[in-house]
Design a protein with these regions (language model features):
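Phosphate-binding/catalytic loops
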Residues: 88-89, 94, 100-169
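Conserved active-site segments centered on acidic
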Residues: 1-91, 160-169
Length: 169
């Protein structure tokens, strides 16, 4: 089982988009039994009285535009923001962040990354000008289409890496 946690600042835009994009891809490829996929925030800004906010409506719209959310596995209607924890570092194989600040804040919360689990999602791009870059935050840019494009590229790159390293076939 490959356990992937996507991380962004608030867990209402980039990281849930990545969570449900990867779920959609692995479901279409028949790989759901090989993965556990979730997402979390580095901040608690989207968590009120212990309850996280849902996926931001424009992020939901972008996912729906691409047919994501129609199956039980990809249904994001019950997804609520949550903050990353120390336990997440022990539990997940990959903690994939949207930007460098997310990496810094994840390590601040979880402790040193001695196992090399905390990375940028776009680190998995192969030979691309976007490799190792941040995924722009659509909360500020309004460009949910660009975020979606980067997330899909990162998820495809991750799957290619997992195939190359023999983790999936």
């Amino acid at each position: 089982m490959i356990k992937v946690l996507f991380i962004c600042h608030g867990n209402i835009c980039r990281s849930p988009m990545a969570e449900f994009v990867l779920k959609d891809i692995v479901e279409k490829r028949g790989l759901t039994s090989h993965f556990e996929i979730a997402s979390a925030a580095t901040s608690n800004e989207e968590i009120w009285n212990g309850t996280g906010n849902p996926v931001y409506p424009p992020a939901q719209a972008e996912l729906r535009k691409h047919g994501i959310g129609k199956t039980v596995y990809t249904n994001f209607s019950e997804k609520r923001a949550r903050q990353v924890t120390k336990e997440d570092y022990r539990y997940y194989d990959y903690l994939l962040c949207a930007d460098a600040n997310n990496i810094k804040n994840t390590i601040r919360i979880t402790g040193q990354d001695v196992e090399g689990k905390v990375k940028l999602l776009l680190d998995f791009l192969a030979d691309s000008e976007r490799k190792g870059k941040s995924i722009s935050d659509p909360w500020y840019s309004g460009r949910f289409d660009e975020t979606y494009r980067d997330v899909v590229s990162g998820c495809e790159g991750l799957l290619a890496y997992l195939k190359e390293t023999g983790r999936i076939s």
